[in-house]
Amino acid sequence: MACSLKDELLCSICLSIYQDPVSLGCEHYFCRRCITEHWVRQEAQGARDCPECRRTFAEPALAPSLKLANIVERYSSFPLDAILNARRAARPCQAHDKVKLFCLTDRALLCFFCDEPALHEQHQVTGIDDAFDELQRELKDQLQALQDSEREHTEALQLLKRQLAETKSSTKSLRTTIGEAFERLHRLLRERQKAMLEELEADTARTLTDIEQKVQRYSQQLRKVQEGAQILQERLAETDRHTFLAGVASLSERLKGKIHETNLTYEDFPTSKYTGPLQYTIWKSLFQDIHPVPAALTLDPGTAHQRLILSDDCTIVAYGNLHPQPLQDSPKRFDVEVSVLGSEAFSSGVHYWEVVVAEKTQWVIGLAHEAASRKGSIQIQPSRGFYCIVMHDGNQYSACTEPWTRLNVRDKLDKVGVFLDYDQGLLIFYNADDMSWLYTFREKFPGKLCSYFSPGQSHANGKNVQPLRINTVRI
């Protein structure tokens, strides 16, 4: 069996790897220092021999072995553990009966003699068994990562497919909802149009009948008046005094019923009923059939923080810079957060209201569980029973989620619309000026909800002094 590579590179004198190898005439190799010291010890005998074959030399010449020195240098550049751990049982090189190694850096099998060692300097080289074990672990880790990625992609695809189906279903449902909403408006408009046209026809018929009756009556009276005038003209044409005077006595009888006072009275056709701000008139008549309309909410003074000032009608709330009001504390009242709740509690149905937030730099509005804590510092977030949006830092808007969700608002809000569909678990915020969407909470509400308002603190420099005001639509 062939010797290991290390055995081939050992000096037989020091039993270590060659250092500055030299060769003798017999072609055996030694470390220059080792053979020199050996021959120094033999000087007394007057002969110098080869420690391997015992061939003697009178004046031996030490020839440097550059090739062997290169092999030693290249061998030394490989990790010693890799060389020592190589097994003779490893797959042999076809050209050399030597142990094959594996370069982990290049991912390649290599033979020390066949391959150029310089190509693998500073590389991670190991034995076949160690390379097998390490690459097995590495590939298993990669397989696990791929399997994890496969599972994540499968779950993502399932989610996307579910969202695709839900989006299609929601779109179909929304088409129906939008169609029904507009059809209801169309139906209401058609009904109002029909009623108005019928009313117009009735007014027209009534007016025309009245006029026609008066035309008939005045036509009859006109004929009698004309007859009376004819009688008088004939009498006045009589020039004979006796004849003229003789017929005067019968004139009164002949003129009876011929003279009528006009006294014409009539009502103008009611055109004003069908002109003027016609669309506004129609809108007002439709308003009672539109649902939901902005609710006339009021604030609950019993929940208001002591710093808050409410209007007499409880629709306006402002932060007061003066000392806190001497209000009686109760479990209902906020004691740290400058907040107030609405008086009405919602547990079903569809509701909508609007809040004027113009010229403010800070506020919070939305909904709160009726049972939510009102004492101490409160985290305004769904897990605490609050579903709100907030204006902060002067011109930023966020939904109070966990963490906050920044809202994409182009222009500063002047009025915010709040839409609640309790049964569907929807709370939607709008820019009430153009009804553009701001944010949607989708929740399964566990109990009664109250509208929530916080005007924020005002500042001595005049910032945020404007109140929050519930917008009441009056028809």
Curated annotation (Swiss-Prot):
PTM section of the record: Polyubiquitinated, autoubiquitinated in the presence of UBE2D2.
Gene Ontology biological process terms in this record: innate immune response; negative regulation of epithelial to mesenchymal transition; negative regulation of viral transcription; positive regulation of antifungal innate immune response; positive regulation of canonical NF-kappaB signal transduction; positive regulation of DNA-binding transcription factor activity; positive regulation of NF-kappaB transcription factor activity; protein K27-linked ubiquitination
ZnF locations on chain (RING-type): 11-54
GO CC terms of this entry: cytoplasm; cytosol
Pfam families: PRY, SPRY, zf-B_box, zf-C3HC4_4
GO MF entry, a single one: ubiquitin protein ligase activity
EC number from the UniProt entry: 2.3.2.27
Associated pathway: Protein modification; protein ubiquitination
InterPro entries registered for this protein in UniProt: B30.2/SPRY, B30.2/SPRY_sf, Butyrophylin_SPRY, ConA-like_dom_sf, PRY, PRY/SPRY_TRIM62, SPRY_dom, TRIM/RBCC
Domain B30.2/SPRY: 277-475
Zinc finger residue ranges, B box-type: 88-128
Coiled-coil blocks: 127-241
Compartments in which it is found: Cytoplasm
Domain of life, per lineage: Eukaryota
Job description of the protein: E3 ubiquitin ligase that plays a role in antifungal immunity by mediating 'Lys-27'-linked ubiquitination of CARD9 downstream of C-type lectin receptors; leading to CARD9 activation, followed by activation of NF-kappa-B and MAP kinase p38 pathways. E3 ubiquitin ligase activity is dependent on E2 ubiquitin-conjugating enzyme UBE2D2.
Record comment regarding domains: The RING finger is required for ubiquitin ligase activity.
Subunit structure: Interacts with the ubiquitin-conjugating enzyme, UBE2D2.
The protein, known as: E3 ubiquitin-protein ligase TRIM62
Upper classification of the organism: Eukaryota, Metazoa, Chordata, Craniata, Vertebrata
